[in-house]
UniProtKB/Swiss-Prot annotation:
Compartmental location: Cytoplasm
Segments for region (Disordered): 64-488, 500-543, 555-574
Low complexity composition-biased segments: 265-277, 381-399
Name used for this protein in its record: Specifically androgen-regulated gene protein
GN (gene name): Sarg
Residues modified as Phosphoserine: 130, 132, 397, 412, 524
Biased composition (Basic and acidic residues): 206-224, 233-260, 344-354, 451-465
Family per similarity comment: Belongs to the SARG family.
This protein's record includes keyword Phosphoprotein: yes
Highest taxon of source: Eukaryota
Phosphothreonine modified-residue sites: 334
Coiled coil: none
Organism from which the protein derives: Mus musculus
Assigned keywords, A-Z: Cytoplasm, Phosphoprotein, Receptor
InterPro entries per the UniProt record, alphabetical: SARG (IPR026152)
Length: 606
């Protein structure tokens, strides 16, 4: 009798609708409609067992929900269903009834332990118990519901809707894990409650719940389909309404009756949702599940926002220009922006850097009285060299340093570059590149005008006025302009010597200014680390000043003999020696190494 009792009970319930053939489904509906009292009595006895197992399984599910096992088990059960529903549909349709007996006997004592079913299913020739159950589920769903959709929906959905209140407290926790087993208990408890409460209250529930199902079913049909990717268009046209109603009741009972079931379903549903489209489910699921699922992509998006910030930090095309990240970022973004505000910002920054003694040479070219001319022509030189594109904003920006005599001394070597650009266009590419490479002027403030002057003096008397103009620009002092007209070559040494001496003076000034501004001292170590070539370039200027004392004239004369051949190469090599000097400078290499480098460049011969 228990098997027969299980038959009508389970047939009325969904698992047999899943498992049995259409004949089973018809018998289930007929048994429910016809002999409702007797079936309710049998089901009441079974439900007692079911309730015991539900309590046990709920405890186990809570433990598993904490450990996350229940969610893991529910997903594989759903995934194989989608893959194996069709092949087993053909195989297991004739076996529906004998399987239904075995499977329904199992779920009553064993709801959570679906894997315990495989021995019985293997006896029938099935593959895996957990997989065979969902296979049978799809058979019953696709076939029985199509044929007896109206009958099954009316009684089964009524009983399931009415009585899912109690059993789904435990079964909702089981969720997708025991979808096959969820309906039998609701139908069985439905029988208990119907036996006690009689039929009219379920009818009232029918009137209320079909509305809810009509409302909630459309969002949850896709949601459940996402939980178990299966042939839902075929299977769950009527059946989706049942489980939608069940799930809707579960949601309502979750919020109203028992909140702990929410804790059970939440761990189960988020994995299924994460693996599957969550839109419809998020609509139907309780609010507790939505934020947990939606917040994870939001956090991921926040993490995505971080890498662009890192990219902005890492975007250091102007890194060697200003090794400091904030300087580089502002220079890049501000090149496109208005130059005036950028110039003001850079002026303040460069004043601090000048106090540190790091990028003073960079600040100097803008200090020129020819700021506008230098900026315009450096902009012209921008297409020539990308490093030059960084220079134009800089020369225009810091006019503040011009007030300092040390800055004026430093301006002298680089002013030669800017007026040279304006006066002698033949030298523009050669000399515009050094302003682009600000460190070059520091490292080689003297040799650049040397080469130009030697080339001019070497080749023709025409470059002599250029030399005078260059020298006038080189000292950066209008007094030196007069001297340069007379001294020409020696003026190079004098101007460079004065600039080097004045560089020594600003170094003292930088120390005093550093004492004045201790916060710059804090900034200084990082600036030195990032821009080691520049402090070394200052050292190179000092070292080169030692050469200037009595060696520049001889070196210039040697270069004068060399440079006719280097006229064409001056474009290439004038940018190169400062680059090499910058590389040599951070090491603080003595003059001998510098001379060797100059010899390799062909600028010096001893």
């Amino acid at each position: 009798m228990p098997k027969r009792e299980l038959w009508p009970a389970g047939l009325c319930s969904e698992p047999v609708t899943h498992i049995g053939s259409c004949g089973d489904m018809m018998s289930t509906t007929s048994t429910r409609s016809g002999s409702s009292d007797s079936s309710y009595d049998f089901l009441s006895a079974e439900e007692k067992e079911c309730l015991l197992f539900l309590e046990k399984t709920i405890g186990s599910l809570e433990a598993e929900a904490d450990s996350g096992l229940s969610t893991d088990e529910s997903e594989p059960a759903t995934s194989p269903r989608s893959f194996r529903a069709l092949p087993t549909a053909t195989q297991q349709a004739p076996q529906g009834k004998p399987e239904a007996t075995d499977i329904q006997q199992v779920p009553v004592p064993k709801r959570v332990a679906q894997p315990s079913c495989p021995p019985e299913s293997h006896s029938l020739g099935l593959r895996a118990g957990s997989y065979s159950l969902p296979r049978n589920l799809h058979l019953g769903r696709s076939q029985n519901l199509r044929e007896s959709a109206t009958q099954a929906n009316s009684p089964v959905s009524e009983a399931s809707e009415v009585f899912l209140e109690e059993p789904e407290k435990g079964q909702t926790s089981q969720g997708a894990k025991a979808k096959t087993i969820q309906p039998p208990a609701p139908s069985q408890k439905g029988t208990l409650d119907l036996s006690t409460v009689l039929i009219p209250p379920p009818e009232a529930f029918q009137d209320i719940r079909p509305k809810e199902s009509g409302e909630e079913s459309p969002p949850k049909k896709p949601g459940e389909q996402t939980h178990t990717p299966q042939v839902h268009s075929l299977e769950r046209s009527p059946h989706s309404q049942k489980k939608v109603e069940m799930s809707s009741e579960t949601v309502s009972h979750k919020a109203t009756e028992k909140g702990w079931t929410e804790g059970l379903q939440q761990p189960q549903q988020p994995p299924a949702q994460s693996s599957q489209p969550t839109k419809a489910e998020e609509l139907s699921l309780p609010s507790g599940v939505k934020p947990s699922i939606q917040q994870t992509p939001l956090t991921a998006s926040k993490a995505r926002k971080l890498p662009p910030n890192i990219v902005l930090k890492s975007s250091r095309s102007s890194f060697h220009s200003h090794p400091q990240n904030w300087l580089s970022n502002h220079t890049e973004a501000t090149d496109s922006g208005p130059v005036s505000s950028l110039q003001e910002q850079r002026k303040a920054r460069r004043e601090a850097l000048e106090k540190l003694g790091l990028p003073q040479d960079q600040d100097d070219p803008s200090l020129l009285v020819n700021k506008h001319t230098s900026t315009l022509k450096v902009r012209e030189a921008q297409p020539q060299t990308p490093s030059q594109a960084r220079a134009p904003a800089r020369p225009a920006s810091p006019a503040l340093v011009s007030g300092t005599a040390s800055a004026a001394g430093k301006v002298s070597p680089k002013k030669a570059v800017a007026p040279m650009d304006s006066l002698s266009k033949g030298w523009i590419p050669t000399q515009e590149t050094p302003p682009g490479k600000v460190a070059e002027a520091k490292s080689m403030p003297i040799p650049i005008p040397k080469t130009l002057k030697e080339n001019s003096s070497r080749t023709q008397p025409k470059p002599d006025p250029r030399l005078t103009l260059q020298e006038s620009s080189i000292p950066g002092l209008r007094q030196m302009n007069f001297k340069s007209n007379t001294l020409e070559r020696s003026g190079v040494g004098l101007s460079s010597y004065l600039s080097a001496a004045e560089k020594k003076d600003p170094s003292c000034q930088t120390s005093t200014s550093l004492g004045k501004s201790p916060f710059l001292d804090k900034v200084s170590p990082s600036a030195f680390r990032n821009s080691r070539p520049r402090p070394a370039s200052l050292g190179m200027g000092k070292d080169f000043a030692g050469i200037q004392g009595g060696k520049l004239v001889g070196l210039e004369q040697d270069q004068c003999s060399q440079q006719p051949s280097f006229k064409g190469q001056s474009y290439d090599k004038l940018p190169r020696p400062p680059c090499i000097s910058v590389k040599i400078s951070p090491k603080g290499i003595p003059d001998g190494h510098r001379r060797e480098a100059l010899k390799k460049l062909g600028l010096l011969k001893e």
